[in-house]
Amino acid sequence: MALVSQARSLGKYFLLLDNLLVVLGFFIVFPLISIRFVDQLGWAAVLVGLALGLRQLVQQGLGIFGGAIADRFGAKPMIVTGMLMRAAGFALMAMADEPWILWLACALSGLGGTLFDPPRTALVIKLTRPHERGRFYSLLMMQDSAGAVIGALIGSWLLQYDFHFVCWTGAVIFILAAGWNVWLLPAYRISTVRAPMKEGLMRVLRDRRFVTYVLTLTGYYMLSVQVMLMLPIVVNEIAGSPAAVKWMYAIEAALSLTLLYPIARWSEKRFRLEQRLMFGLLIMTLSLFPVGLITHLQTLFMFICFFYMGSIIAEPARETLSASLADSRARGSYMGFSRLGLALGGALGYTGGGWMYDTGRTLEMPELPWFLLGVIGLITLVGLYWQFNQRRIESAMLSGS
């Protein structure tokens, strides 16, 4: 037992460092895409939104297949291959001077994520015990926030010189992450049984409770992805400089590093997981309604704070609930399918968000996209409330134990 505990402990430290590299490499590049191609090159927001949505759709929509392959062949080969593929996507993005090249680069980056994301998520479940899982997710999310602001700072600084430097730096970090996994990641099996890929896929698809939960989250993700598209654009518009975007991520980092873990510890003893998820989504929804009417940067940052607070409350509960509902015989497949809501919500949020933003500007109604996003958030809340009351989930799962 002592050896098992030691292996779990070392594995969690490995996951934390690995996650830092992945987050840093991602946020050096992706928050700058909308600024580079919309603000600097003058492309239509819908074209850039389509590229970002394509990355999301490919990565998360095909995640169930990446997870099923990892269930069959193990985590390590999928993680290493996926990271190298993302590095190649970033290198191609540096050469994007036409929309189709950007779309191809984002698709390649998303395909890499399809391969490495589900097995990495399944490893978290494998290496953490149920009672500590929610807190470990909180630590990962705190790290995500810190990595996001550091990555955005580095990316913004590099963008002053050339967008090529932004992309190449992100690619190098993913190559380093791949090497880290080659060197130190053991050949873990992420599921309790090694079954054919089809069996894992069918096990997920027959689980109506899990499928309903995942698809309901589509609206939640439509809101959450706007930190990568419309929020950076509106911050840049009001501030008059892309340098202000880094402060948006600084706010997220400050709130996450100071509040995420304490809130998770406090709330897990007092509220059920679905209550935390819905309350966080409500705060996110209400904070988006007035954004289109704001003309001062300080006021905008205040509502962005509210949005991040909602995310801080909702995200650990959402991730823990997804892990609790996963069948240990097909962890990779379940974690891959759990990203389908993110795939649909991301594709709709990016593409639809870009279209709504362009339409709002054309009609001289800047509040239009934010009002529609708020309505989507309210509809999602109703869907979650119905699901959790019509399809009761075991209390042990919902309490996070």
From Swiss-Prot:
PANTHER family for this protein: MULTIDRUG RESISTANCE PROTEIN MDTH, RESISTANCE PROTEIN MDTM, PUTATIVE-RELATED-RELATED
Descriptive protein name: Multidrug resistance protein MdtH
Family: Belongs to the major facilitator superfamily. DHA1 family. MdtH (TC 2.A.1.2.21) subfamily.
UniProt keyword annotations, A-Z: Cell inner membrane, Cell membrane, Membrane, Transmembrane, Transmembrane helix, Transport
Database matches in SUPFAM superfamilies: MFS general substrate transporter
Source organism: Yersinia enterocolitica serotype O:8 / biotype 1B (strain NCTC 13174 / 8081)
Membrane topology, as annotated: Multi-pass membrane protein
UniProt KW Cell inner membrane keyword: yes
Compartments reported by the entry: Cell inner membrane
InterPro entries: MFS, MFS_dom, MFS_trans_sf, MFS_Transporters, Multidrug-R_MdtH
Chief location category: membrane
Transmembrane annotation, as ranges: 13-33, 34-54, 99-116, 139-159, 165-185, 214-234, 243-263, 277-297, 299-319, 340-360, 368-388
